[in-house]
Amino acid sequence: MTISNSVPITPELIAAHGLKPDEYQRILDLVGREPSFTELGIFSAMWNEHCSYKSSKKWLRTLPTTGPQVIQGPGENAGVVDIGDGDCVVFKMESHNHPSFIEPYQGAATGVGGILRDVFTMGARPIAAMNALRFGAPDHPKTRHLVAGVVSGVGGYGNSFGVPTVGGEVNFDARYNGNILVNAFAAGLAKTNAIFLSEAKGVGLPVVYLGAKTGRDGVGGATMASAEFDDKIDEKRPTVQVGDPFTEKCLLEACLELMASGAVIAIQDMGAAGLTCSAVEMGAKGDLGIELDLDKVPVREERMSAYEMMLSESQERMLMVLRPEKEKEAEAIFHKWGLDFAIVGKTTDDLRFRVLHQGDQVADLPIKDLGDKAPEYDRPWIEPKKPAPLAANDIPQADVADALLKLLGGPDLSSRRWVWEQYDTLIQGNSLQLPGGDAGVVRVEGHATKALAFSSDVTPRYCEADPYEGGKQAVAECWRNLTATGALPLAATDNLNFGNPERPEIMGQLVGAVKGIGDACRALGFPIVSGNVSLYNETNGQGILPTPTIGGVGLIADWSKMVRTGFAAQDQMILLVGAPASWGTHLGQSVYFRDIHGRTDGPPPPVDLAHEKRVGDHVRSLIASGIVTAAHDVSDGGIAVALAEMAMASGIGATVPGLVGTDPIPVWFGEDQGRYLLTLSIDPHGDEWDAIRKQQGELGIFAPWIGSTGGDALKLGDAKAIPVGDLKAAHEGWFPRFMDQAS
């Protein structure tokens, strides 16, 4: 079946394309006539939230995006950060939420494929991937099916392509029942003098189509990704793309070989809105027009219309502006790799986007108004209502050991081994830390000592309670996780997942979170260099928890001094760095409240950014000195869970006497921010320890020696000792049991 270009443009058709009446009027004013059906599709694709960021652009501009290490900030396919010696790291995080809910395997797989293309389009070879996944309640009938499909899709694509998955997150909450989140991160290495951008340059130059053939899969995908879901969700299945990781691997090698030949002027991957978005972005960025001849586009289905070809989101495709004298060489490279190579258009000097098909001009539009001059909204927003503070004596009690075992064996804090064992975490041979620690770490190929650390973080329940503090905390925890390996945090990418921005309370969540992210990034010297916004994550009016995911990258100068989470030896001192005098105080929004007592009240823990920076810099200096043998940031579940994780990672127990005369619940389960647990290899009664104590006093950092490693059990204060084997059994049991339940 093919779709005519002369379909009548009705109000119903306009609405079906996600365009509001005032937006359609703007189209009429710009074009001076009724648009063709293909033109309507082009406007719909370019003006939706997924491509235009029309609801969030105003606030994204407030984020810090520069720094001495930043080579390329937002606006390109990925961010680029200098790591010295002529090398740079290229990275980005992007959502594939809506497709993954409709068709979990292909949705997740093509999410991985898309983010890998964003990285190698810039000239970088991918070296690491992460995935931040949010699913509905474990007892929801769809959850297990979605988990199985998404994890299989992530592993199927990443493993076949050949990139290690080094970290990520998996969480469950009923607010994701109708909208799961699949946020995919990728990073690659490139040379600082060989970064490739998407800005077209030069008039009359060939525009070249590269990669796989075009089919009807994914038609309307970008528009679907900008809409709320309803009960007819399964009808959207045809708009999910289908990925082929082996073709993508060939595309990677062909692109890098072509880039090395000097043939590439500009290059853009075909992601959301396919040929439309890639062509418009290349032309608009370069202040050039683009003319495309769709009769030249390689297709794998018969009788495809111009509309379908322009909006197809078939995977593993690129668009490039080529040096004309290199055409034969470029074509030979792509044919060698078994890929299509076709000159499908040219650059022009008239700022028009023209599309030809079967002898007709099916689109003739102003390219800048499609691209960087798309509509932008200053949507009304209201400050979200914040929860009341908890009364000082509002500390519900529980047996400390029993509560710890229940937390470790629950849906949110249990081991994710079932997930990451389906991913190839060691391919390429450079992975230095397996998933399950604070951050993934990968050696920098060709350098004797350098490594890169990667972490992905956000605590949605904090963001729901207070978006500003939640935004700050997402950045701070990411920065802290990188620091806990010994890495210097360099820069971050954000993936902002929210509900319907046309509701002022939801827009208020977005505004608050972005303000918090911006303040934290400025205070920590941790700029945002790339990112993605995913809105309308709602089903039948029920929105997700606000989830501004932060993916961070850090540099380890000497990976021989890198530290891991697990205790390294018996009889080593345990240090709690950055804590208040009572070690822990804050129970509002804690997992202890939620999972032990069924409470979701109270404010989230505040983040003191000056304290965060001071403590993190101190921890990093201790690690660099070589005396730290293990490190772990304290987050969900407080000190108790952090100590248990360190014990389980090593099989070594610990004894931590606790505080006399202090309620043990906030001590062990409080989620105060800015804290680390370290083990040291030095004599706690020697001069070296005295010098460290003196330095901490001068910095105003409270860092008590709270206990020692040793034995095969974890003993917290007066609570009964828990054998490390029992901790592991609780921790490792939940996920396999959940996934093995009979359907």
Curated annotation (Swiss-Prot):
Q: Where does substrate bind?
A: 95-98, 117, 241, 313-315, 534
Locate the active site: 50, 96
InterPro entries per record: PRibForGlyAmidine_synth_PurL, PurL_linker, PurM-like_C_dom, PurM-like_C_sf, PurM-like_N, PurM-like_N_sf
Q: Name one GO biological process term.
A: 'de novo' IMP biosynthetic process
Quote the SUPFAM superfamilies the UniProt record gives. Answer: PurM C-terminal domain-like, PurM N-terminal domain-like
Which positions in this protein are listed as binding ATP? 53, 92, 494, 531
Q: What class of enzyme is it?
A: ligase
Going by the entry's taxonomy, the superkingdom of the source organism is recorded as Bacteria
Kindly list the GO molecular function terms attached to this UniProt entry.
ATP binding; magnesium ion binding; phosphoribosylformylglycinamidine synthase activity
Query: Where is Mg(2+) 1 bound in this sequence?
Result: 94, 532
- Give GO cellular component annotations, separated by semicolons: cytoplasm
* Principal subcellular localization: cytoplasm
The similarity comment for this entry is: Belongs to the FGAMS family.
What quaternary arrangement does the UniProt entry report? Answer: Monomer. Part of the FGAM synthase complex composed of 1 PurL, 1 PurQ and 2 PurS subunits.
Q: Which HAMAP family match?
A: PurL_2 (MF_00420)
Its annotated function is as follows:
Part of the phosphoribosylformylglycinamidine synthase complex involved in the purines biosynthetic pathway. Catalyzes the ATP-dependent conversion of formylglycinamide ribonucleotide (FGAR) and glutamine to yield formylglycinamidine ribonucleotide (FGAM) and glutamate. The FGAM synthase complex is composed of three subunits. PurQ produces an ammonia molecule by converting glutamine to glutamate. PurL transfers the ammonia molecule to FGAR to form FGAM in an ATP-dependent manner.
Identification of the protein by name:
Phosphoribosylformylglycinamidine synthase subunit PurL
User: Which organism is the protein's source?
Assistant: Mesorhizobium japonicum (strain LMG 29417 / CECT 9101 / MAFF 303099)
Its ancestry begins with: Bacteria, Pseudomonadati, Pseudomonadota, Alphaproteobacteria, Hyphomicrobiales
Q: Which gene encodes it?
A: purL
